[in-house]
């Protein structure tokens, strides 16, 4: 793999994270309750941290052993609501987040098999694993919320 290709993929991933930050900032502006705004700020910070991690990959590269396995609770796969049409209840914020992270996970997973270059494939699998962690974060919040009888 050419170094330029690696850098372009990382830049693409950073741009997607910046889109996610804007997404959460936009939701903060729409949120009606302070606790919702605080949660959205935490999510924004999580995405900012992901940018930092991706930027470090510019220097360190990525190896197979860097890819962590994240169990898939599959909650978002069973939710059929269009996240764009949902209001900003706590439940719907979680659904929007789950669906966004699921989309990113699927994109990076698909890209990992489309490129024959092992280094590019490993990079996309690493990015997919990070998105899977974010998705699981939302699914855990959603699961906890549902268990409380909501």
What do these predicted regions represent?
Residues 1-150:
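Non-heme di-metal
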């Amino acid at each position: 793999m050419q170094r330029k290709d690696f850098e372009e993929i990382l830049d693409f991933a950073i741009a997607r994270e910046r889109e996610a930050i804007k997404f959460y900032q936009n939701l903060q502006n729409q949120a009606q309750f302070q606790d919702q705004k605080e949660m959205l700020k935490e999510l924004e910070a999580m995405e900012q941290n992901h940018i930092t991690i991706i930027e470090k990959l510019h220097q360190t590269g990525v190896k197979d052993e860097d890819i962590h396995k994240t169990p898939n609770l599959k909650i978002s796969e069973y939710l059929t609501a269009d996240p764009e049409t949902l209001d900003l209840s706590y439940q719907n914020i979680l659904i929007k987040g789950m669906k966004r992270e699921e989309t990113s996970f699927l994109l990076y997973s698909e890209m990992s098999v489309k490129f024959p270059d092992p280094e590019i494939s490993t990079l996309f699998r690493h990015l997919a694993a990070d998105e899977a962690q974010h998705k699981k974060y939302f699914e855990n919040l959603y699961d906890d919320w549902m268990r409380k009888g909501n």
